[in-house]
């Protein structure tokens, strides 16, 4: 367990700015150009209009090191709080992605995080979307910085029989409650710096809520870095509301203007609130209780024989180890893509070309979805899970003619 009263040996650092300072490092560092794509740097605003079934989205790109079309697309959400969804093309969630693309985006993002943060540093990934991204950034930071005082944890919507560190809310989400558990890191002092990782930021409210909760639990935090793939928060001034001096970085920054259209009824009414928390009676620590080093574990079940191209599907919050498996197979020469199931209800159209609905393998009773998985594309599907034998919905297994691969017995 981390000790909030134990002081760490200070690491060399620059003077900390005032809490109200707004520091965005997205364009501050030397631009990274891709030799295969010299136009990667955007030096002029780009504007486009996206028509969705729930309304109209005006997208303005202000800068970045990745083009918009490589990073994300957009879809209509089944959510009255927010009618659109930013659909990442590099996360391995809603859109199938090659592992090397996921790795490159995480590495590029990690390179933009200030390397002189005072330690210990805690990297925090937001459930469910940014868990794999957060763990990948943690992995990259330890390599890039050559430091061992960089740790990882992530928020979760699963209740465990462990001590809760804090709780916070994601107001616009279909599943607003997040839990963070006390890290099981004996002898490790409480962090002095936070690196908060998410796929995108719009108003900054969720990041501020997370930061407030963590600073309340760890008052010794001195500075915060926020790292997101796409930053749409221009004009919201959220840095000034953060509880500690904050820098932010992204691969692309811009602005979104949403005009809601006529209300579109959800395709399926959920019998239970999508914010329901699950409960894991048995749990292996793949990140919820903190990690000092990156994990890379083979499945407990026998790995199926590979015949042809492959799709590896993570489930819910269990995404990092399936990604690592896919990455290893890709290095061995296999044609493999990664994606994952989601609690996010979205309409078909825009970035969503296919949609499967099925029961949650975590037992919450909340419908889950898999998008853009074409069962006729010739790929063999492996469904990866952490929830034990017999927890995967047979309807999903049959729809994809999938083989189930488990990391828990």
Predicted feature locations:
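PRPP-associated nucleotide enzymes
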Residues: 1-409
């Amino acid at each position: 367990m981390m000790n909030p009263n134990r002081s760490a040996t200070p690491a060399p650092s620059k003077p900390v700015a005032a809490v109200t300072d707004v520091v965005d490092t997205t364009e501050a560092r030397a631009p990274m150009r891709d030799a295969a794509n010299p136009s990667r740097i955007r030096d002029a605003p780009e504007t486009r209009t996206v028509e969705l079934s729930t309304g109209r989205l005006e997208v303005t790109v202000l800068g970045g090191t990745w083009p918009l079309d490589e990073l994300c697309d957009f879809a209509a959400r089944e959510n009255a709080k927010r009618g659109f969804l930013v659909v990442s093309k590099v996360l391995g969630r809603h859109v199938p992605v090659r592992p090397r693309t996921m790795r490159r985006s995480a590495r590029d993002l990690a390179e933009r995080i200030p390397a002189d943060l005072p330690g210990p540093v805690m990297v925090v990934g937001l459930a469910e979307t940014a868990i794999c991204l957060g763990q990948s950034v943690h992995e990259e930071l330890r390599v890039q910085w050559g430091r061992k005082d960089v740790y990882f944890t992530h928020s979760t919507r699963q209740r465990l029989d462990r001590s809760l560190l804090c709780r916070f809310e994601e107001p616009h989400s279909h599943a607003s409650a997040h839990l963070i558990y006390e890290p099981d890191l004996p002898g490790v002092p409480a962090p002095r710096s936070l690196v908060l990782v998410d796929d995108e930021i719009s108003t900054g409210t969720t990041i501020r809520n997370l930061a407030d909760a963590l600073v309340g639990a760890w008052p010794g935090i001195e500075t915060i870095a926020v790292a997101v793939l796409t930053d749409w928060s221009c004009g919201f001034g959220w840095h000034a509301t953060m509880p500690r001096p904050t820098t932010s970085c992204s691969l692309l920054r811009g602005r979104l203007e949403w005009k809601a259209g006529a209300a579109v009824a959800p395709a399926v009414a959920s019998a239970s609130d999508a914010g329901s928390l699950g409960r894991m009676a048995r749990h292996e620590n793949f990140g919820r209780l903190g990690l000092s080093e990156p994990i890379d574990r083979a499945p407990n079940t026998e790995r199926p024989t590979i015949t042809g191209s492959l799709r590896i599907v993570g489930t819910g919050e269990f995404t990092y180890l399936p990604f690592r498996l896919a990455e290893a197979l890709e290095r061995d020469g296999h044609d493999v893509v990664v994606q994952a199931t989601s609690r996010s209800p979205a309409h078909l159209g825009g970035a969503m070309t296919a949609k499967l609905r099925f029961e949650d393998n975590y037992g919450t009773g909340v419908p889950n979805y898999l998008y853009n998985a074409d069962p006729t594309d010739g790929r063999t599907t492996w469904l990866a899970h952490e929830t034990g034998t017999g927890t995967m919905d047979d309807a999903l297994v049959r729809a994809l003619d999938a083989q189930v691969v488990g990391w828990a017995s």
